[in-house]
């Protein structure tokens, strides 16, 4: 995969290699309900998020599932996914990148700016090898 972003120690002092950063979350009460329903427009936003996050898109696919949409972007550094439920004004987002040159937090922000949630639950996980 891409370069290893950093090296850290765990709680017992052992060295860990951090291979990737996974930024994920739930978007509640999204104001942009039309975007929640449009595979084509949501793909554009995911491509912009990848660009803003310094990621290289290899492929992107979307599916209309009921009223909602699922978008999966395979990036050179890993992936970005968005799943929507317009009837609940809700979306889930995952941005996972193994590239130290990327900014998954920025990609996540771009998605939030577009969907306009009233509330965001955000999590971050370092993927590492001890």
Swiss-Prot record:
Cofactor entry: pyruvate
The reaction(s) this protein catalyses: S-adenosyl-L-methionine + H(+) = S-adenosyl 3-(methylsulfanyl)propylamine + CO2
EC number: 4.1.1.50
Designated name of the protein: S-adenosylmethionine decarboxylase proenzyme
Keywords recorded for this protein, A-Z: Autocatalytic cleavage, Decarboxylase, Lyase, Polyamine biosynthesis, Pyruvate, S-adenosyl-L-methionine, Schiff base, Spermidine biosynthesis, Zymogen
Cited NCBIfam families: SAM_DCase_Bsu (TIGR03330)
Active-site residues per Swiss-Prot or TrEMBL entry: 78, 83, 98
Family statement: Belongs to the prokaryotic AdoMetDC family. Type 1 subfamily.
A GO cellular-component term linked to this record: cytosol
Residues flagged as site, Cleavage (non-hydrolytic): 77-78
Subunit structure: Heterotetramer of two alpha and two beta chains arranged as a dimer of alpha/beta heterodimers.
Function per UniProt: Catalyzes the decarboxylation of S-adenosylmethionine to S-adenosylmethioninamine (dcAdoMet), the propylamine donor required for the synthesis of the polyamines spermine and spermidine from the diamine putrescine.
InterPro entries: AdoMetDC_fam_prok, S-AdoMet_deCO2ase_core, S-AdoMet_deCOase_pro-enz
Pathway entry: Amine and polyamine biosynthesis; S-adenosylmethioninamine biosynthesis; S-adenosylmethioninamine from S-adenosyl-L-methionine: step 1/1
Pyruvic acid (Ser) sites (modified residues): 78
Molecular function in Gene Ontology: adenosylmethionine decarboxylase activity
Gene name per UniProt: speH
A Pfam family of this chain: AdoMet_dc
PTM field: Is synthesized initially as an inactive proenzyme. Formation of the active enzyme involves a self-maturation process in which the active site pyruvoyl group is generated from an internal serine residue via an autocatalytic post-translational modification. Two non-identical subunits are generated from the proenzyme in this reaction, and the pyruvate is formed at the N-terminus of the alpha chain, which is derived from the carboxyl end of the proenzyme.
Highest taxon listed in the record's lineage: Archaea
Matching SUPFAM superfamilies: S-adenosylmethionine decarboxylase (SSF56276)
Free-text comment on the cofactor: Binds 1 pyruvoyl group covalently per subunit.
GO biological process: spermidine biosynthetic process
